[in-house]
Each structure stands twice: as C-alpha cells, then as structure tokens.
Amino acid sequence: MSGFYHKHFLKLLDFTPAELNSLLQLAAKLKADKKSGKEEAKLTGKNIALIFEKDSTRTRCSFEVAAYDQGARVTYLGPSGSQIGHKESIKDTARVLGRMYDGIQYRGYGQEIVETLAEYAGVPVWNGLTNEFHPTQLLADLLTMQEHLPGKAFNEMTLVYAGDARNNMGNSMLEAAALTGLDLRLVAPQACWPEAALVTECRALAQQNGGNITLTEDVAKGVEGADFIYTDVWVSMGEAKEKWAERIALLRDYQVNSKMMQLTGNPEVKFLHCLPAFHDDQTTLGKKMAEEFGLHGGMEVTDEVFESAASIVFDQAENRMHTIKAVMVATLSK
C-alpha cells in the first residue's frame, strides 16, 4: 500500500489523518472481501513473529487469523517463550528476529521497548499494546463507530470514555481524537486523567480537524448527547488487592449503567468496551469483586448494559482482526 510499505505501527500520532483514513478504508475492504469469499492473499511467504510479554486472547487471535488469511506464517513467543529483556537485550532481540522475520508484533510493557524493537529490527514492528498506547484497539474502535454511524463523519460524532482515563486506552483515544476530529469526552475523577502534555497536544490537533477534547468529573454533563459510551476494566488480576478497594472507591460513580446511558438523551447511544469486561460474576476476578465489594451485576459496566441491544462490543472484537490485517497488509505488501 503506497506510503505504508515497511513503516512501523507504534502509535497513532505517527500518522496523518489521511493515512489513518486509508487504513480504515483498507480494513473495511478486507472485511468485505473476506465475507464475500473474494479475499486475495497479499502476504504469501511472509513470516511474522508475535512477541507477547502480556497474554491476550483477542490480540493473539487477531494477528494469527489475519496472517493465515493473508498467506503468512506466524511464530508465537509467549511470556515464557523468549529471552527478550532477560538473557538478551531488546536491541539484540530486534536484530536477531529482524534477520528471520518480515514483521514483528510486540505486546507488553513500556513503549520504549517497542520503539527499540522498531529502531533495530529492520522490518516493520507493530504495537499490539504497551503500558502507554494501544493503537490497534483504536483502529478497531474507529471502524466499528463508522459502521454504526455510516452517515456521519468522525468530527460529527461524540465519544465518551468513562472510568480510568490515565491508561493506554485513554492515551490512544486522545491520539485518535486528534487525528479524526472526534468530540472526545474523558469522564473520570481528576486523579484518573491523562498527562496534561498529551492532552494539550491532542486537543490542539483535534480542534484543527473540527473536534474537541473535554475532561470532566461531571458524569451528567460529560455524557450528554453522546453517540458512544466506552469503558475499560478498573482492576487487573496482577494488581495488589489493596489497589482494588482504592480503585473501586474512586471509580464506582463512573460505572456504565442504564442511568448513565439514559443521561445521554440519545436513545440510539451505543456501548463500547475493549474486553475482557467484568460485567457479571462468571469469571474468577468477577466473582472475587462480587464477594469482596458487593459488585454483583458488574463492575465497570453492568450486565444489563453489556447484554443490551446498545452493546456493540463483539463487533469491536471482530474488527480487531480486520484492522490488524489492514496494518500488516499495508506495511508488508507493495
């Protein structure tokens, strides 16, 4: 794909609005081609390394299925399957894998790790998730939003993110809003707002593209008129138990529930979540949350909203694969 060949995909602000739109158009085409049985393999003979320092269901499956659909082969290197950063430096790992593979995906910790891989690998490197950014997720989100509001441009859409906005999702949403001109509202306690420098940079770019970025603690004001309400988990299994109580107390008022959906005043508002979601007590962590904190029926989102007609989370999950495929095709095929 012109302009993308051999480029890295590390964070959204590395691209222009036009380039982001091109990736979304390619993803939509690849999705349509797959469903119609007309998909053409562009990556036959390519070898792809998937480095996972953090486990994942959606990211791994998306990369593997996308690669297989396009004729490529993959090697999965899980948390215990490589020496990256332990017995071998990131720099050396990059130079070794770059000699063997045509592309490298990294999902793990600091953004500096994926940046170092990109600097030394000599082949395209894709960010499957770092502590700071989650760009492939936002590609899927944007495609999903386009599909559900086909008559609107991004700068005519309002996206609300409710909850802990200081994480990789909050940062990547800021970057997405900067490039698309979304009306993005981060509805969260001030302690959970992203770094001010990134907010300032992205707000200026968003305004140039016809949008705006708002940070507020006021739920009613923040969600008014929203087209989409998005949230993410409040706690992770690896976090200390003491953190759970602190985080839940901080975020309890920002749970996505039927009241919040009604406060939008938009009967067509849709619910988004990058998954996994703790919307019931059918998981180990969900059960612990229910027992410890009385969070029966959901944590960051209620089961009622998650299972409602407004929920489009599984469209999002499917679109992870189509958008990741677009990134690989764009960067590995001429």
UniProtKB/Swiss-Prot annotation:
SUPFAM superfamilies according to UniProt: Aspartate/ornithine carbamoyltransferase (SSF53671)
Superkingdom as given in the UniProt entry: Bacteria
Main location: cytoplasm
Metabolic or biological pathway, per its Swiss-Prot or TrEMBL entry: Amino-acid biosynthesis; L-arginine biosynthesis; L-arginine from L-ornithine and carbamoyl phosphate: step 1/3
Pfam family, one: OTCace_N
Role of this protein: Reversibly catalyzes the transfer of the carbamoyl group from carbamoyl phosphate (CP) to the N(epsilon) atom of ornithine (ORN) to produce L-citrulline.
Cellular component per GO, a single term: cytoplasm
Binding site for L-ornithine: N168, D232, S236, M237
EC number in record: 2.1.3.3
UniProt-recorded name of the protein: Ornithine carbamoyltransferase
Organism from which the protein derives: Escherichia coli (strain 55989 / EAEC)
Binding site for carbamoyl phosphate: S56, T57, R58, T59, Q83, R107, H134, P135, T136, Q137, C274, L275, R320
Catalyzed reactions per annotation: carbamoyl phosphate + L-ornithine = L-citrulline + phosphate + H(+)
Family, similarity comment: Belongs to the aspartate/ornithine carbamoyltransferase superfamily. OTCase family.
